[in-house]
Structure formats: structure tokens, C-alpha cells
Amino acid sequence: MNPTPVIEVENLTKRYPGRTAISGLSFTVGQGEIVGLLGPNGAGKSTTMRILACYLPASSGTARVAGHDVFTESEEVRRRIGYLPESNPLHLDMRVREYLKFRARLKGLSIGRSRDRVDRVLEQCGLADVSRKVIGQLSKGFRQRVGLADALVHEPDLIILDEPTIGLDPHQIRSVRQLIKDLGKLHTILISTHILPEVEMTCSRVLILHEGRIVAADTPANLQHSISTGDQVIAEIAAPLEQLRHAWEHAPEVEHFDIAPCDGDYFRCALTPRPGVDLRPQVFSLAKENNWRLRELTHGRHSLEEIFVHLTRKDREETL
């Protein structure tokens, strides 16, 4: 028998006067998954998370966390989630340990249990060395860790993270990403972001939102094969640009191509074939016939950025 999903969402809709923020969302998240909500600003990511965190009522549909309805059992749901909103509100005049003890008591933990859990999350989130410091004196990266520790302190079934690396420098981003991956070994995590590498490096599954609707849901690896059943070929060739364009435009097996300059006289040609076609022999033959200098010929794969652009463009075309 399969365990109950940690998140169950069915036909979830949120309307505001004059606009619909999310429309008919349905998805599940299983135990131990790190699932990314990916989409541009305004796609409905934060709205979805606020509904799951009981911060915002839906207009229609159902949502359950660990088997409990977020609308009729909101108190029980709040006990089972740890939520880090995008704004990460903290008491900046409190010390780290003091703040986490305060938050643990607010979440219903006993004095003894609070002490044990605060010690645990300080270690887990790399905060032990700054536990006596005032939060307002910490860097943005450490403040984000305090927010994560707060979300973890009551041992929730689900951790909800809304844009957890926004505003951080590259070093802080890497540090927080690694922390999230480590937490994913023990917790179910739902993370929202508009940063494509964030999902690729952190998440086991992706939900792509566009204009309040889910347009794709799969693993990053499967999504990278979703645009075409053919395998993209990357060729770096030194040749006149017009010759390359003419060759790919008149090659019947090439469904789509992009040409970008590389170093020197070389161009990077990204060639998407028709389904089931391997373009490499044809590219090699063309290079030989035209005396092009070919220095690289490999299978490529679509980036999440290409997938996102493709899916949202396709979605817009279907609604016209």
C-alpha cells in the first residue's frame, strides 16, 4: 500500500477581482521529495505556497498536507509544516538561540523539548558558532539559515521555502542550496523559484507554472527530453555563416537550429532533428564536402531554460 502523499492538491483556484492567480492546479508530492515550483514572477508560485501554509484561503478546490485539509484542519496543518516566506521575517534585536527557543515555544514544544530541538537545528543549519549573536548583526546568508532553522525546529512533515536564495551572493547561494539538499534527506520540501539553475541543482521533480496553471510536471532529466524525441546535436564549425544557415535550412532532417558565434572563426550550431534521426553522420559529411573545420560534434540536451521558453510559448499559442 502506497503511503499517503505529503501534499495533495486538486483543482485549486484563487481569484482576485479582475484576475485569477491560480487556476485548477492539481498535483501531489510524496514523502522525501524535493519538488520545485518553477515560473516567472506572477506565475502563481507564492499564492500556491501561501494556501498550503494556511496563510491564504483558496476560492475553490482542495489541498491537504499529511492527510489534513488546509481549510478545515488548518491548526493541525500548521503543526506539520515549516514555512520560510520570501520576506523571511525575523526579530532582528534577538539573539539566534533566544529567537529559536521563542519560536519553538510558540509552536507548542515543551521547555525541555525546545532546548533539545534548538541545539539540533543550530547544528543542522550551521548556526552553532553564531548562536549568541544578535540576528540583526548577521549576514543575509546567515539570516536565511536562521529562517530555515525556525522552519525546522518543530520537526515538520513538510518544509515550504519561497524563493530561499533571493538576494544572496553566489557563495551564500551555494551554501544554502547545499543545506536544502541535506535537509531533503530527512524532510519533504516544496521550493519555489524563478531561477532555473536552482531547480536543476536542488530538486528531484519540477512543476512549471505559467499564468496560474501547471504546464509541465516531471523530473528535470525527463523534461530535458520532452521537447522532441530526437536528440539535439551540438557542432562547433569554422565556416562562413551564410553557408551554415543555408545548409541547415535545406536539410530536411533538421527541424530547428540555432547558430551562435564561438571563439575565432567557429560557430556553435545547436541542431534539433526530426524524431528518431541521428544528425551526426550528416553533419560530418557536410563538413567534409564543404571543407568546414569541425572541432566538436556531440549530442546535446535541452536546458531547463529552453524547456521553459518552449512550454510557455506553446501554451500561449494554444490559447490564441
Where are the regions a protein language model picked out?
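A generic structural signal for secondary-structure junctions
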Residues: G82, G108, G126, G147, ...
